[in-house]
Amino acid sequence: MGHQEELKPEQVDLKVTPFVGYLRRTWSDFCATSSIHGLKYTRDEDTNKIVHLVWLLISVVMFICAVVMARTFYMDYRSSPTRMNVESDNTPVNRLYFPPVTICPDVLFNMQKSEAFLNTLRLPKGAELRGILRKLHIFYGFMLDDERYSAEDIEQMEALLFLNNLTIPEFVEHLRWNCDEILYRCRFNGEIMDCSKIFQLSKTFFGHCCSFNLRQKGWVNNKLNNLESFKVFHLNSLNFTAQRAIGGLRYGLSVVVRYKDDNYDPLQSYSYGVKLLIQEADAFPSAHSAAKFIAFNSETFAAVRPQETFCSSAVKALIIEERNCVFQNEFPMRYFSDYVYPNCELNCRVTNMVKFCGCHTYFFDFNRTSDRICTFRDIPCLVDNFANIITRKKSTQCYCPLTCEHIDYDVQLTNFPLELNMPVADKFYSGLAKNDGVLHVFINSFSYRRLRRDLLSNMVTLVSNLGSAFSLFVGMSMLSVVEIIYYFSVILRKNYKLECETRSQMLHKKPKFAWPKANDTHSKEQKSVFIIHKS
Protein backbone atom coordinates (compact mmCIF):
# COMPACT_ATOMS: atom_id res chain seq x y z
CA MET A 1 0.00 0.00 0.00
CA GLY A 2 3.07 2.22 0.44
CA HIS A 3 2.47 3.09 4.09
CA GLN A 4 3.49 1.26 7.29
CA GLU A 5 0.96 -0.43 9.52
CA GLU A 6 2.95 0.47 12.67
CA LEU A 7 5.69 2.89 13.58
CA LYS A 8 8.91 2.31 15.45
CA PRO A 9 9.90 4.83 18.10
CA GLU A 10 12.98 5.86 16.15
CA GLN A 11 10.71 6.83 13.21
CA VAL A 12 8.93 9.45 15.29
CA ASP A 13 10.39 12.94 15.33
CA LEU A 14 9.54 14.48 18.68
CA LYS A 15 10.89 17.84 17.54
CA VAL A 16 7.76 18.44 15.42
CA THR A 17 4.10 18.42 16.34
CA PRO A 18 1.98 15.32 15.73
CA PHE A 19 0.14 17.19 12.96
CA VAL A 20 3.34 17.86 11.02
CA GLY A 21 4.50 14.32 11.66
CA TYR A 22 1.54 12.44 10.27
CA LEU A 23 1.11 14.94 7.40
CA ARG A 24 4.75 14.51 6.38
CA ARG A 25 4.42 10.73 6.56
CA THR A 26 1.26 10.75 4.41
CA TRP A 27 3.02 12.92 1.81
CA SER A 28 5.97 10.52 1.70
CA ASP A 29 3.65 7.54 1.25
CA PHE A 30 1.76 9.33 -1.50
CA CYS A 31 4.92 10.31 -3.40
CA ALA A 32 6.23 6.75 -3.22
CA THR A 33 3.13 5.16 -4.73
CA SER A 34 1.41 7.93 -6.76
CA SER A 35 0.82 7.59 -10.50
CA ILE A 36 1.64 11.30 -10.93
CA HIS A 37 4.93 11.59 -12.75
CA GLY A 38 7.97 12.95 -10.93
CA LEU A 39 6.67 12.92 -7.37
CA LYS A 40 8.46 9.72 -6.37
CA TYR A 41 11.82 11.33 -7.17
CA THR A 42 11.14 14.08 -4.62
CA ARG A 43 11.32 11.45 -1.84
CA ASP A 44 13.88 9.06 -3.36
CA GLU A 45 16.18 7.81 -0.58
CA ASP A 46 19.00 7.11 -3.05
CA THR A 47 19.43 10.78 -3.95
CA ASN A 48 20.27 13.91 -2.01
CA LYS A 49 18.16 16.93 -1.09
CA ILE A 50 19.28 18.94 -4.10
CA VAL A 51 17.83 16.32 -6.46
CA HIS A 52 14.66 16.26 -4.36
CA LEU A 53 14.35 20.03 -4.65
CA VAL A 54 14.94 20.02 -8.42
CA TRP A 55 12.26 17.38 -8.96
CA LEU A 56 9.88 19.28 -6.70
CA LEU A 57 10.38 22.46 -8.75
CA ILE A 58 9.88 20.53 -11.99
CA SER A 59 6.66 19.01 -10.67
CA VAL A 60 5.35 22.40 -9.51
CA VAL A 61 6.16 24.06 -12.85
CA MET A 62 4.50 21.24 -14.79
CA PHE A 63 1.42 21.45 -12.58
CA ILE A 64 1.19 25.21 -13.13
CA CYS A 65 1.44 24.67 -16.91
CA ALA A 66 -1.36 22.11 -16.72
CA VAL A 67 -3.56 24.54 -14.76
CA VAL A 68 -2.89 27.36 -17.26
CA MET A 69 -3.75 25.15 -20.23
CA ALA A 70 -6.87 23.82 -18.51
CA ARG A 71 -7.97 27.37 -17.75
CA THR A 72 -7.40 28.32 -21.39
CA PHE A 73 -9.60 25.44 -22.53
CA TYR A 74 -12.30 26.44 -20.06
CA MET A 75 -12.24 30.16 -20.96
CA ASP A 76 -12.46 29.32 -24.67
CA TYR A 77 -15.43 27.12 -23.90
CA ARG A 78 -17.16 29.90 -21.94
CA SER A 79 -16.35 32.77 -24.30
CA SER A 80 -17.25 31.01 -27.54
CA PRO A 81 -19.22 27.87 -26.82
CA THR A 82 -20.85 27.69 -30.24
CA ARG A 83 -19.72 27.33 -33.83
CA MET A 84 -21.33 27.63 -37.24
CA ASN A 85 -21.72 24.56 -39.41
CA VAL A 86 -23.14 24.38 -42.90
CA GLU A 87 -26.24 22.27 -42.50
CA SER A 88 -26.94 22.19 -46.22
CA ASP A 89 -26.34 24.15 -49.40
CA ASN A 90 -29.33 22.54 -51.07
CA THR A 91 -32.23 23.32 -48.76
CA PRO A 92 -35.42 23.85 -50.82
CA VAL A 93 -36.15 27.56 -50.99
CA ASN A 94 -39.89 27.02 -50.52
CA ARG A 95 -39.21 26.48 -46.82
CA LEU A 96 -38.79 30.25 -46.55
CA TYR A 97 -41.22 33.11 -46.82
CA PHE A 98 -40.69 35.38 -49.78
CA PRO A 99 -38.34 38.18 -48.69
CA PRO A 100 -40.16 41.24 -47.34
CA VAL A 101 -39.97 43.98 -49.96
CA THR A 102 -40.39 47.65 -49.10
CA ILE A 103 -40.55 50.38 -51.72
CA CYS A 104 -40.02 53.95 -50.54
CA PRO A 105 -40.46 57.09 -52.65
CA ASP A 106 -37.28 59.10 -52.70
CA VAL A 107 -39.26 62.25 -51.88
CA LEU A 108 -41.16 62.37 -48.61
CA PHE A 109 -44.48 63.77 -49.80
CA ASN A 110 -46.76 63.83 -52.80
CA MET A 111 -46.54 67.50 -53.74
CA GLN A 112 -49.79 67.55 -55.74
CA LYS A 113 -51.62 66.00 -52.81
CA SER A 114 -49.85 68.29 -50.34
CA GLU A 115 -50.79 71.41 -52.28
CA ALA A 116 -54.43 70.35 -52.42
CA PHE A 117 -54.50 69.73 -48.67
CA LEU A 118 -52.72 72.96 -47.76
CA ASN A 119 -55.33 74.86 -49.79
CA THR A 120 -57.92 73.71 -47.25
CA LEU A 121 -55.95 75.02 -44.24
CA ARG A 122 -55.65 78.41 -42.59
CA LEU A 123 -52.16 79.72 -43.23
CA PRO A 124 -50.18 81.75 -40.70
CA LYS A 125 -50.13 85.50 -41.14
CA GLY A 126 -47.75 86.51 -43.91
CA ALA A 127 -47.31 82.93 -45.21
CA GLU A 128 -47.95 81.83 -48.79
CA LEU A 129 -48.87 78.42 -50.12
CA ARG A 130 -45.72 78.14 -52.23
CA GLY A 131 -43.59 79.12 -49.28
CA ILE A 132 -45.18 76.47 -47.07
CA LEU A 133 -44.64 73.84 -49.79
CA ARG A 134 -40.96 74.76 -49.98
CA LYS A 135 -40.67 74.51 -46.20
CA LEU A 136 -41.87 70.89 -46.16
CA HIS A 137 -38.24 69.85 -46.52
CA ILE A 138 -37.98 70.67 -42.82
CA PHE A 139 -39.28 67.15 -42.19
CA TYR A 140 -35.82 65.84 -43.07
CA GLY A 141 -34.73 67.32 -39.76
CA PHE A 142 -36.52 64.42 -38.07
CA MET A 143 -34.17 62.00 -39.86
CA LEU A 144 -30.85 63.66 -40.70
CA ASP A 145 -28.48 66.40 -39.57
CA ASP A 146 -27.50 67.65 -43.02
CA GLU A 147 -29.09 71.07 -42.57
CA ARG A 148 -29.86 73.62 -39.88
CA TYR A 149 -33.31 75.19 -40.07
CA SER A 150 -34.10 78.78 -39.16
CA ALA A 151 -36.20 79.57 -36.11
CA GLU A 152 -38.54 81.59 -38.35
CA ASP A 153 -39.33 78.57 -40.55
CA ILE A 154 -39.83 76.34 -37.52
CA GLU A 155 -42.22 78.78 -35.84
CA GLN A 156 -44.17 79.26 -39.06
CA MET A 157 -44.73 75.50 -39.41
CA GLU A 158 -45.70 75.28 -35.73
CA ALA A 159 -48.19 78.10 -36.25
CA LEU A 160 -49.69 76.20 -39.19
CA LEU A 161 -50.35 73.19 -36.96
CA PHE A 162 -51.75 75.33 -34.15
CA LEU A 163 -54.14 77.30 -36.37
CA ASN A 164 -55.62 74.09 -37.80
CA ASN A 165 -55.55 72.04 -34.58
CA LEU A 166 -53.28 69.42 -36.15
CA THR A 167 -50.68 67.10 -34.71
CA ILE A 168 -47.58 66.00 -36.60
CA PRO A 169 -48.98 62.49 -37.36
CA GLU A 170 -52.27 63.98 -38.60
CA PHE A 171 -50.44 66.49 -40.76
CA VAL A 172 -48.21 63.79 -42.26
CA GLU A 173 -51.19 61.56 -43.05
CA HIS A 174 -52.50 64.14 -45.52
CA LEU A 175 -49.15 64.75 -47.19
CA ARG A 176 -47.66 61.29 -47.54
CA TRP A 177 -47.84 58.96 -50.50
CA ASN A 178 -50.42 56.21 -50.75
CA CYS A 179 -49.34 52.92 -52.27
CA ASP A 180 -51.61 53.42 -55.29
CA GLU A 181 -49.73 56.67 -55.95
CA ILE A 182 -46.42 54.81 -56.23
CA LEU A 183 -47.23 51.35 -57.60
CA TYR A 184 -48.91 51.18 -60.98
CA ARG A 185 -48.96 47.41 -61.57
CA CYS A 186 -47.94 44.28 -59.63
CA ARG A 187 -47.33 40.64 -60.44
CA PHE A 188 -46.53 37.80 -58.08
CA ASN A 189 -45.99 34.12 -58.90
CA GLY A 190 -46.75 34.89 -62.53
CA GLU A 191 -50.17 36.40 -61.77
CA ILE A 192 -50.96 40.08 -62.37
CA MET A 193 -52.92 41.42 -59.41
CA ASP A 194 -54.06 44.58 -57.69
CA CYS A 195 -51.11 46.01 -55.77
CA SER A 196 -53.32 46.82 -52.79
CA LYS A 197 -53.85 43.08 -52.21
CA ILE A 198 -50.20 42.42 -51.49
CA PHE A 199 -48.69 45.82 -50.62
CA GLN A 200 -49.60 47.85 -47.56
CA LEU A 201 -48.54 51.15 -46.11
CA SER A 202 -45.76 50.78 -43.55
CA LYS A 203 -43.64 53.01 -41.36
CA THR A 204 -39.93 53.11 -42.00
CA PHE A 205 -36.98 55.26 -41.05
CA PHE A 206 -37.48 57.00 -44.41
CA GLY A 207 -41.09 57.91 -43.68
CA HIS A 208 -44.14 56.07 -44.99
CA CYS A 209 -43.47 53.36 -47.58
CA CYS A 210 -45.23 50.38 -49.16
CA SER A 211 -44.31 46.89 -48.00
CA PHE A 212 -44.97 43.35 -49.14
CA ASN A 213 -44.74 40.36 -46.76
CA LEU A 214 -43.69 42.54 -43.82
CA ARG A 215 -44.84 42.00 -40.23
CA GLN A 216 -45.19 45.37 -38.53
CA LYS A 217 -47.18 45.34 -35.32
CA GLY A 218 -48.84 48.27 -33.66
CA TRP A 219 -50.73 50.38 -36.16
CA VAL A 220 -52.79 50.66 -39.30
CA ASN A 221 -54.49 53.76 -40.62
CA ASN A 222 -58.13 54.37 -41.47
CA LYS A 223 -58.18 56.11 -44.81
CA LEU A 224 -60.75 58.92 -44.62
CA ASN A 225 -61.11 61.95 -46.83
CA ASN A 226 -61.96 64.81 -44.51
CA LEU A 227 -59.96 66.25 -41.67
CA GLU A 228 -62.71 66.20 -39.06
CA SER A 229 -63.12 62.43 -39.22
CA PHE A 230 -59.41 61.58 -39.39
CA LYS A 231 -58.32 58.82 -37.00
CA VAL A 232 -55.51 56.38 -36.57
CA PHE A 233 -56.59 52.98 -35.34
CA HIS A 234 -54.02 51.01 -33.39
CA LEU A 235 -54.60 47.40 -34.30
CA ASN A 236 -52.59 44.24 -33.86
CA SER A 237 -50.39 44.33 -36.92
CA LEU A 238 -49.90 44.99 -40.57
CA ASN A 239 -51.33 42.06 -42.50
CA PHE A 240 -48.61 39.51 -43.13
CA THR A 241 -49.20 37.77 -46.45
CA ALA A 242 -47.07 34.72 -45.54
CA GLN A 243 -46.29 34.13 -49.20
CA ARG A 244 -43.78 31.32 -49.66
CA ALA A 245 -40.71 31.67 -51.85
CA ILE A 246 -40.21 29.87 -55.14
CA GLY A 247 -36.97 30.13 -57.04
CA GLY A 248 -36.71 31.82 -60.41
CA LEU A 249 -37.76 35.07 -62.08
CA ARG A 250 -41.15 33.70 -63.11
CA TYR A 251 -42.22 33.17 -59.49
CA GLY A 252 -40.86 36.43 -58.16
CA LEU A 253 -42.40 39.82 -57.50
CA SER A 254 -42.60 42.39 -60.29
CA VAL A 255 -43.87 45.96 -59.99
CA VAL A 256 -44.21 48.96 -62.26
CA VAL A 257 -43.32 52.08 -60.28
CA ARG A 258 -45.00 55.32 -61.34
CA TYR A 259 -45.41 58.51 -59.33
CA LYS A 260 -48.99 59.75 -59.45
CA ASP A 261 -48.01 63.36 -58.91
CA ASP A 262 -48.35 66.00 -61.60
CA ASN A 263 -46.18 68.38 -59.57
CA TYR A 264 -43.29 65.92 -59.36
CA ASP A 265 -40.09 67.43 -60.71
CA PRO A 266 -37.04 65.15 -60.58
CA LEU A 267 -34.68 68.12 -60.94
CA GLN A 268 -36.25 70.08 -58.12
CA SER A 269 -36.55 67.06 -55.85
CA TYR A 270 -33.05 65.75 -56.69
CA SER A 271 -34.55 62.31 -57.12
CA TYR A 272 -35.26 60.08 -60.05
CA GLY A 273 -36.32 56.79 -58.57
CA VAL A 274 -37.34 54.89 -55.44
CA LYS A 275 -35.60 53.00 -52.65
CA LEU A 276 -35.79 49.22 -52.41
CA LEU A 277 -35.41 47.77 -48.91
CA ILE A 278 -35.19 44.05 -48.15
CA GLN A 279 -34.90 42.76 -44.58
CA GLU A 280 -36.36 40.19 -42.21
CA ALA A 281 -40.13 40.06 -41.81
CA ASP A 282 -40.02 41.38 -38.22
CA ALA A 283 -37.36 44.02 -38.81
CA PHE A 284 -38.20 47.71 -39.04
CA PRO A 285 -37.15 48.93 -42.52
CA SER A 286 -34.17 51.21 -42.06
CA ALA A 287 -30.55 51.70 -43.04
CA HIS A 288 -29.88 48.22 -41.60
CA SER A 289 -31.86 46.73 -44.50
CA ALA A 290 -30.34 45.69 -47.80
CA ALA A 291 -31.03 49.04 -49.51
CA LYS A 292 -30.84 49.66 -53.26
CA PHE A 293 -31.82 52.56 -55.49
CA ILE A 294 -34.21 51.77 -58.34
CA ALA A 295 -34.01 54.35 -61.11
CA PHE A 296 -36.88 55.37 -63.37
CA ASN A 297 -36.70 54.72 -67.11
CA SER A 298 -34.99 51.43 -66.41
CA GLU A 299 -35.84 47.78 -65.85
CA THR A 300 -34.11 46.43 -62.75
CA PHE A 301 -33.61 42.81 -61.75
CA ALA A 302 -32.93 42.27 -58.04
CA ALA A 303 -31.59 38.75 -57.48
CA VAL A 304 -31.92 37.76 -53.83
CA ARG A 305 -29.79 35.08 -52.20
CA PRO A 306 -31.08 34.11 -48.73
CA GLN A 307 -29.04 32.49 -46.00
CA GLU A 308 -30.69 31.11 -42.88
CA THR A 309 -29.08 30.63 -39.48
CA PHE A 310 -30.78 28.38 -36.93
CA CYS A 311 -29.83 26.74 -33.63
CA SER A 312 -29.52 23.12 -32.64
CA SER A 313 -31.47 21.85 -29.65
CA ALA A 314 -28.24 21.72 -27.62
CA VAL A 315 -27.65 25.45 -28.16
CA LYS A 316 -31.27 26.28 -27.33
CA ALA A 317 -30.81 24.51 -23.99
CA LEU A 318 -27.94 26.84 -23.03
CA ILE A 319 -28.53 29.95 -20.97
CA ILE A 320 -28.19 33.32 -22.71
CA GLU A 321 -24.78 34.05 -21.17
CA GLU A 322 -23.36 30.81 -22.60
CA ARG A 323 -24.77 30.93 -26.12
CA ASN A 324 -24.17 34.71 -26.48
CA CYS A 325 -27.35 35.27 -28.45
CA VAL A 326 -31.08 35.61 -27.83
CA PHE A 327 -34.37 34.51 -29.33
CA GLN A 328 -37.19 36.91 -30.15
CA ASN A 329 -39.03 36.56 -26.84
CA GLU A 330 -35.95 36.70 -24.59
CA PHE A 331 -35.02 40.38 -24.88
CA PRO A 332 -38.00 42.74 -24.49
CA MET A 333 -37.72 46.25 -25.91
CA ARG A 334 -39.67 49.38 -25.13
CA TYR A 335 -40.48 50.54 -28.64
CA PHE A 336 -40.54 47.33 -30.70
CA SER A 337 -42.44 44.13 -30.03
CA ASP A 338 -40.17 41.57 -31.74
CA TYR A 339 -36.47 41.31 -31.13
CA VAL A 340 -34.17 41.31 -34.11
CA TYR A 341 -30.80 43.00 -34.02
CA PRO A 342 -31.72 46.01 -36.24
CA ASN A 343 -34.78 46.67 -34.07
CA CYS A 344 -32.57 46.78 -30.99
CA GLU A 345 -30.28 49.35 -32.60
CA LEU A 346 -33.31 51.47 -33.52
CA ASN A 347 -34.79 51.00 -30.06
CA CYS A 348 -31.56 52.48 -28.72
CA ARG A 349 -31.91 55.39 -31.12
CA VAL A 350 -35.47 56.13 -29.99
CA THR A 351 -34.40 55.84 -26.35
CA ASN A 352 -31.69 58.44 -26.98
CA MET A 353 -34.21 60.73 -28.69
CA VAL A 354 -36.41 60.65 -25.60
CA LYS A 355 -33.38 61.04 -23.33
CA PHE A 356 -31.92 64.11 -25.05
CA CYS A 357 -35.02 65.77 -26.53
CA GLY A 358 -37.95 64.36 -24.56
CA CYS A 359 -39.75 62.96 -27.62
CA HIS A 360 -39.46 60.57 -30.56
CA THR A 361 -40.21 61.08 -34.25
CA TYR A 362 -43.59 60.27 -35.78
CA PHE A 363 -42.43 57.25 -37.77
CA PHE A 364 -41.39 55.46 -34.57
CA ASP A 365 -44.86 55.74 -33.05
CA PHE A 366 -46.42 52.28 -32.63
CA ASN A 367 -48.69 53.11 -29.67
CA ARG A 368 -46.50 51.12 -27.26
CA THR A 369 -45.66 54.05 -24.98
CA SER A 370 -47.07 57.41 -23.96
CA ASP A 371 -43.90 59.27 -24.98
CA ARG A 372 -44.44 62.57 -26.73
CA ILE A 373 -44.09 62.77 -30.51
CA CYS A 374 -41.60 65.37 -31.67
CA THR A 375 -42.86 68.58 -33.25
CA PHE A 376 -41.07 71.12 -35.43
CA ARG A 377 -39.73 72.91 -32.33
CA ASP A 378 -37.84 69.72 -31.41
CA ILE A 379 -35.91 69.60 -34.71
CA PRO A 380 -33.00 71.80 -33.51
CA CYS A 381 -32.53 69.46 -30.54
CA LEU A 382 -32.65 66.38 -32.79
CA VAL A 383 -30.10 67.90 -35.18
CA ASP A 384 -27.75 69.10 -32.43
CA ASN A 385 -27.83 65.71 -30.69
CA PHE A 386 -27.76 63.63 -33.87
CA ALA A 387 -24.39 62.03 -33.03
CA ASN A 388 -25.65 61.00 -29.60
CA ILE A 389 -28.96 59.74 -30.96
CA ILE A 390 -27.46 57.46 -33.60
CA THR A 391 -24.92 56.16 -31.03
CA ARG A 392 -21.76 57.47 -32.63
CA LYS A 393 -20.44 57.98 -29.13
CA LYS A 394 -19.74 54.94 -27.00
CA SER A 395 -21.47 56.49 -23.99
CA THR A 396 -24.82 56.46 -25.81
CA GLN A 397 -24.58 52.94 -27.19
CA CYS A 398 -26.85 50.18 -25.93
CA TYR A 399 -26.35 46.50 -25.33
CA CYS A 400 -27.81 44.62 -28.28
CA PRO A 401 -27.11 40.87 -28.29
CA LEU A 402 -27.05 38.97 -31.55
CA THR A 403 -30.10 37.00 -32.59
CA CYS A 404 -29.67 33.23 -32.50
CA GLU A 405 -31.85 32.59 -35.54
CA HIS A 406 -32.12 34.97 -38.46
CA ILE A 407 -32.19 35.23 -42.24
CA ASP A 408 -29.74 37.36 -44.22
CA TYR A 409 -30.40 38.55 -47.74
CA ASP A 410 -27.75 39.34 -50.31
CA VAL A 411 -29.18 41.46 -53.14
CA GLN A 412 -27.51 41.91 -56.51
CA LEU A 413 -28.91 44.37 -59.07
CA THR A 414 -28.84 44.28 -62.84
CA ASN A 415 -30.58 47.01 -64.84
CA PHE A 416 -31.22 47.94 -68.44
CA PRO A 417 -32.77 50.96 -70.15
CA LEU A 418 -36.54 50.60 -70.31
CA GLU A 419 -37.88 50.02 -73.82
CA LEU A 420 -41.39 51.45 -74.00
CA ASN A 421 -42.34 50.19 -77.47
CA MET A 422 -40.73 46.78 -77.28
CA PRO A 423 -43.17 44.20 -78.74
CA VAL A 424 -43.82 41.56 -76.06
CA ALA A 425 -46.70 39.20 -75.43
CA ASP A 426 -46.52 39.77 -71.68
CA LYS A 427 -49.46 41.95 -70.57
CA PHE A 428 -47.44 43.13 -67.62
CA TYR A 429 -45.52 45.49 -69.92
CA SER A 430 -48.58 47.02 -71.57
CA GLY A 431 -49.25 50.71 -71.00
CA LEU A 432 -45.76 51.65 -69.88
CA ALA A 433 -45.06 55.37 -69.92
CA LYS A 434 -42.05 57.64 -69.79
CA ASN A 435 -40.43 57.89 -66.34
CA ASP A 436 -41.80 54.50 -65.30
CA GLY A 437 -39.56 52.05 -63.54
CA VAL A 438 -39.89 48.26 -63.70
CA LEU A 439 -38.58 46.18 -60.81
CA HIS A 440 -38.27 42.40 -60.57
CA VAL A 441 -37.41 40.85 -57.19
CA PHE A 442 -36.77 37.11 -57.25
CA ILE A 443 -34.88 34.30 -55.53
CA ASN A 444 -31.95 33.44 -57.77
CA SER A 445 -31.92 29.72 -56.95
CA PHE A 446 -34.23 26.84 -56.06
CA SER A 447 -32.11 26.10 -52.98
CA TYR A 448 -30.32 28.11 -50.33
CA ARG A 449 -27.65 27.74 -47.67
CA ARG A 450 -28.72 26.83 -44.15
CA LEU A 451 -26.26 27.34 -41.29
CA ARG A 452 -26.56 25.56 -37.96
CA ARG A 453 -25.32 27.15 -34.77
CA ASP A 454 -24.03 24.19 -32.76
CA LEU A 455 -21.97 23.58 -29.65
CA LEU A 456 -18.27 24.05 -30.17
CA SER A 457 -17.71 21.46 -27.48
CA ASN A 458 -19.99 19.80 -24.99
CA MET A 459 -19.20 18.96 -21.38
CA VAL A 460 -17.70 15.60 -22.35
CA THR A 461 -15.30 17.30 -24.76
CA LEU A 462 -14.45 19.93 -22.15
CA VAL A 463 -13.61 17.28 -19.54
CA SER A 464 -11.56 15.41 -22.15
CA ASN A 465 -9.59 18.57 -22.95
CA LEU A 466 -8.99 19.31 -19.28
CA GLY A 467 -7.82 15.72 -18.75
CA SER A 468 -5.46 15.89 -21.70
CA ALA A 469 -3.82 19.04 -20.28
CA PHE A 470 -3.07 17.40 -16.93
CA SER A 471 -2.08 14.14 -18.60
CA LEU A 472 0.38 15.92 -20.88
CA PHE A 473 2.23 17.82 -18.15
CA VAL A 474 1.95 15.72 -14.97
CA GLY A 475 0.54 12.39 -16.10
CA MET A 476 -2.64 12.82 -14.07
CA SER A 477 -5.90 11.05 -14.76
CA MET A 478 -9.19 10.69 -12.95
CA LEU A 479 -7.64 7.74 -11.09
CA SER A 480 -4.95 10.11 -9.81
CA VAL A 481 -7.65 12.32 -8.35
CA VAL A 482 -9.11 9.29 -6.57
CA GLU A 483 -5.61 8.50 -5.24
CA ILE A 484 -5.26 12.02 -3.84
CA ILE A 485 -8.63 11.81 -2.13
CA TYR A 486 -7.82 8.34 -0.78
CA TYR A 487 -4.41 9.23 0.62
CA PHE A 488 -5.43 12.50 2.21
CA SER A 489 -8.53 11.05 3.80
CA VAL A 490 -8.15 7.33 4.61
CA ILE A 491 -4.34 7.06 4.80
CA LEU A 492 -4.04 10.43 6.50
CA ARG A 493 -6.41 9.24 9.22
CA LYS A 494 -4.47 5.98 9.68
CA ASN A 495 -1.19 7.83 9.92
CA TYR A 496 -2.74 10.15 12.46
CA LYS A 497 -3.73 7.20 14.66
CA LEU A 498 -0.30 5.58 14.27
CA GLU A 499 1.43 8.83 15.14
CA CYS A 500 -0.68 9.34 18.24
CA GLU A 501 -0.39 5.71 19.40
CA THR A 502 3.38 5.60 18.95
CA ARG A 503 3.91 8.88 20.78
CA SER A 504 1.71 7.62 23.63
CA GLN A 505 3.72 4.39 23.94
CA MET A 506 6.97 6.33 23.97
CA LEU A 507 5.73 8.44 26.85
CA HIS A 508 4.86 5.35 28.92
CA LYS A 509 8.30 3.77 28.32
CA LYS A 510 10.23 6.95 29.11
CA PRO A 511 13.17 6.44 31.65
CA LYS A 512 12.69 7.66 35.24
CA PHE A 513 15.27 10.12 36.64
CA ALA A 514 15.97 11.11 40.36
CA TRP A 515 18.32 13.43 42.16
CA PRO A 516 20.61 11.90 44.90
CA LYS A 517 19.98 12.63 48.55
CA ALA A 518 21.70 15.57 50.17
CA ASN A 519 23.82 13.50 52.64
CA ASP A 520 24.87 11.00 50.04
CA THR A 521 28.46 11.90 49.18
CA HIS A 522 30.40 9.91 46.58
CA SER A 523 33.43 12.12 46.43
CA LYS A 524 34.92 15.14 47.94
CA GLU A 525 33.78 17.26 45.06
CA GLN A 526 30.08 18.07 44.79
CA LYS A 527 28.80 16.41 41.64
CA SER A 528 25.31 15.85 40.29
CA VAL A 529 24.55 12.29 39.48
CA PHE A 530 21.56 10.43 38.04
CA ILE A 531 20.27 7.37 39.78
CA ILE A 532 18.46 5.18 37.34
CA HIS A 533 15.84 2.92 38.78
CA LYS A 534 14.88 -0.02 36.73
CA SER A 535 11.21 -0.57 36.69
From Swiss-Prot:
List residues in topological domain: Cytoplasmic: 1-49, 493-535
Q: In which tissues is it expressed?
A: Embryonic and larval tracheal system; dorsal trunk (but not at fusion with transverse connective), several branches and terminal cells. Also expressed in adult tracheal system; dorsal trunk, but not at the spiracles.
Keyword annotations from UniProtKB, A to Z: Glycoprotein, Ion channel, Ion transport, Membrane, Sodium, Sodium channel, Sodium transport, Transmembrane, Transmembrane helix, Transport
What membrane topology does the annotation report for this chain? Answer: Multi-pass membrane protein
Question: Which GO MF terms are attached to this record?
Answer: ligand-gated sodium channel activity; sodium channel activity; sodium ion transmembrane transporter activity
Can you name a GO cellular component term? plasma membrane
Name the glycosylated positions: N165, N239, N367
Q: Which domain of life is it from?
A: Eukaryota
- Extracellular compartment ranges equal 71-471
Task: Mark the transmembrane ranges.
Answer: 50-70, 472-492
Q: What PANTHER family does this protein map onto?
A: AMILORIDE-SENSITIVE SODIUM CHANNEL-RELATED, PICKPOCKET 16-RELATED
The record's similarity note reads: Belongs to the amiloride-sensitive sodium channel (TC 1.A.6) family.
Q: What is this protein called?
A: Sodium channel protein Nach
Originating gene: Nach
